[in-house]
A protein has these predicted regions:
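N-terminal signal-anchor transmembrane alpha helix of single-pass membrane proteins
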Residues: 1-33
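N-terminal topogenic membrane-targeting module
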Residues: 22-102, 112-115, 121
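The tetratricopeptide repeat
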Residues: 29, 64, 101, 139-147, ...
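Alpha-helical repeat scaffolds
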Residues: 44-53, 78-90, 114-132, 157-172, ...
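Boundary/linker segments of alpha-helical solenoid repeat arrays
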Residues: 58-62, 93-100, 128-139, 173-179, ...
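Long, non-transmembrane cytosolic or organellar matrix-exposed soluble domains/tails
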Residues: 165-235
Length: 235
């Protein structure tokens, strides 16, 4: 009996030590990995780290699968993304996590011009959204909007959000998100065959995106008056 109590006591001490270590190192590890991917854009190093022993200790297999999605989106690894989305679909996730995963899958399907799968993802994300609490729905409203715009433009081929996107671009202070709104507005006006407003939206987009890789291409579209060329951007 005494030996059992001693063993239990030792295990309890080890458990406490491990929990303290985990609480100290896990947040630091998450921060380090976030810097790798979202600040440095080093998707390969991030994925190597995600497969390391420390990551396997801190994150379970399901979480590592979900964490790998963003890195592979940056890499543009279509084959790997198809596998990851298939695995994610089989996992039991909260409705909020399901919305986040489906948002990424929907944007991926749109970029790949896989319209049938995009429709499936769109329907699924709304079903997951409907299961959220009212408070959660408020939090995820912007996420739904962010998939609604490209879905309407590239899958439905409808320019109905043109004016709304221009207004959003006017109110957003961060230049890149504002530029994306103007770019989407230009796409929407092209779908409405409104060349004048498409040109105006493209000029606004160029000003906001002057420090990005889009700038030169947008300028070329404006100079050649090839406004419908903006529809190639699946953003």
């Amino acid at each position: 009996m005494g030996n059992r109590l001693l063993v239990f006591g030792v295990l309890l001490i080890i458990g406490i030590v491990l929990s303290v270590v985990w609480m100290f190192f896990a947040p630091r590890h998450v921060m380090y990995m976030s810097l790798l991917l979202y600040r440095q854009g080093d998707a390969d190093r991030y994925l190597e780290e995600l497969d390391s022993l420390s990551s396997r200790l801190f994150f379970n297999k399901k979480l590592r699968t979900l964490m790998a999605i963003d890195a592979n989106l940056i890499k543009g690894d279509k084959e790997q993304l198809n596998k990851l989305f298939e695995r994610a679909a089989a996992y039991k996730l909260s409705s909020s996590d399901r919305v986040l995963v489906l948002q990424k899958e929907l944007l991926f399907r749109i970029a790949q011009e896989e319209n049938e799968k995009a429709v499936e993802s769109y329907d699924a994300i709304h079903k997951a959204y409907d299961k959220l609490t009212d408070k959660q729905k408020e939090k995820y409203t912007e996420i739904i909007k962010e998939v609604e715009y490209p879905y309407t433009i590239h899958v439905m081929r409808d320019g109905k959000y043109a004016s709304e996107l221009m207004e959003r671009g006017d109110t957003i202070t961060d230049p890149v998100p504002a530029g994306v709104c103007y770019l989407r507005a230009a796409q929407s006006y092209c779908l409405k065959d409104d060349q004048d407003r498409a040109e105006r939206a493209l000029n606004h987009a160029a000003k906001k995106l002057k420090d990005t890789t889009y700038f030169q291409e947008i300028q070329k579209l404006i100079q050649t008056k090839n406004y419908k060329g903006v529809l190639k951007y699946k953003i």
